[in-house]
Amino acid sequence: MKTIILYGYPGECEISEQYLKEYKIQCFSEQEELVPALMETRPAAVWVIMEKAAGMEGVIAVRRIYPDLPVIWFSNDGGFAPQAYRLHVNYFMLMPINEDKIMTALKKYGFHAP
């Protein structure tokens, strides 16, 4: 079973988990929890579901450990799209999260969409 790490607010993680039932999900809301989890095992992808600078800091933390890992970033601020591009984020999308956005992200990276 593929593992997807969700780094985001608890409510957003719960919404995402509804659509990711076929995956082992680990959800973290603090960067201090995210980094050790990334170092323990390489996930199939990381989904950053944070707004503004908090989301960018999460992406930077992932990129320091896994420069080539698929990263999907959901933000509430489209102004962070240039930073997403600079940080080689694979998929940048604006909140709110919904089923269509999740399914698009899954299909784009070769995951089986439930």
Model regions: which residues?
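CheY-like receiver
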Residues: 45-113
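Extreme N-terminal starter segment of soluble prokaryotic enzymes
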Residues: 1-4
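Two-component/phosphorelay signaling modules centered on CheY-like receiver
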Residues: 6-33
